[in-house]
């Protein structure tokens, strides 16, 4: 059966002399393994298109009895091979697709997750800076989509609204709890008993801002790098904690090291 779908390349490996096998996250079929015949031949029409992080519209011959599907066409939409390469952009891109690989459950399709990944990658490849702010936004949306949305505007323990008056009463001191997930006022003893991280007012303000800002308006958020880094590290720790599968911990450590340099 010949089918069309949009796909994100998660991984590629060499196969024989000139071909490659890729792991794709597709809009209609979820996770697929495909073969790109001649994909490493410079003369092939598919050469250079199926690399990690690219988003394409593809045509493939799909058989339910076959584990690896055959791709016949690939129209490139977004690619990390932008005119001005940046090592931090690549590090963020690899971290995103690594988290996606952990989040996908078999071949089950997940259109909301696919749409999130595709839109974030498109934005990542079109911007020239503030990659960590975009990554923080992605982490928050991803963990929320997976069913672990943290409570941000109400205390996760008391359910009290976190208002300016409440913050003043608590001298601006907040905590972020991993379980249950969300922001907490420090008045409760439970905060001490649960795993938590201190949350400054500046970091909380940034968290609150990105939680209510659509992707196309993210550029309007004012954030200094130190606060973005703190929030990014916090959300990555929270997100990783709640992912069920952890097959690529070595990759996570490598990318985290790149981002910290």
Curated annotation (Swiss-Prot):
Entry's Gene Ontology cellular component terms: bacterial nucleoid
Transmembrane segments: none
Gene3D superfamilies in the cross-refs: Nucleic acid-binding proteins, Recombination protein O, C-terminal domain
UniProt entry keywords in alphabetical sequence: DNA damage, DNA recombination, DNA repair
Top-level taxon of origin: Bacteria
GO biological process, one term: DNA recombination
Keyword Metal-binding: no
Similarity comment: family membership: Belongs to the RecO family.
Function: Involved in DNA repair and RecF pathway recombination.
UniProt name for this protein: DNA repair protein RecO
Organism: Chlorobium phaeobacteroides (strain DSM 266 / SMG 266 / 2430)
Gene name of the record: recO
């Amino acid at each position: 059966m010949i089918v069309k779908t949009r796909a994100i390349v998660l991984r590629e490996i060499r196969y024989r002399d000139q071909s490659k096998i890729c792991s794709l996250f597709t809009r209609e079929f979820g996770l697929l393994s495909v073969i790109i015949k001649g994909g490493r031949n410079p003369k092939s029409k598919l050469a250079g298109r199926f690399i990690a992080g690219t988003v394409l519209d593809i045509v493939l011959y799909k058989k339910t009895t076959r584990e690896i599907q055959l791709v016949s066409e690939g129209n490139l939409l977004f690619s990390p091979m932008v005119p001005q390469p940046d090592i931090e952009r690549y590090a963020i891109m690899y971290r995103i697709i690594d988290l996606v690989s952990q989040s996908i459950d078999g071949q089950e399709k997940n259109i909301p997750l696919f749409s999130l990944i595709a839109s974030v990658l498109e934005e990542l490849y079109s911007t020239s800076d503030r990659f960590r702010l975009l990554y923080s936004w992605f982490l928050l949306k991803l963990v929320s989509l997976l069913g672990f949305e943290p409570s941000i505007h109400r205390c996760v323990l008391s359910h009290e609204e976190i208002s300016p008056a409440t913050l003043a009463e608590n001298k601006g001191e907040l905590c972020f709890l991993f379980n249950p997930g969300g922001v907490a006022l420090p008045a409760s003893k439970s905060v001490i008993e649960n795993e938590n991280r201190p949350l400054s007012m500046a970091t909380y303000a940034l968290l609150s801002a990105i939680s209510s800002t659509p992707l196309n308006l993210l550029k309007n958020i004012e954030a200094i790098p130190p606060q973005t880094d703190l929030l990014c590290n916090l959300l990555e720790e929270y997100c990783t904690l709640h992912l069920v599968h952890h097959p690529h911990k070595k990759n996570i450590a490598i990318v985290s090291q790149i981002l910290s340099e």
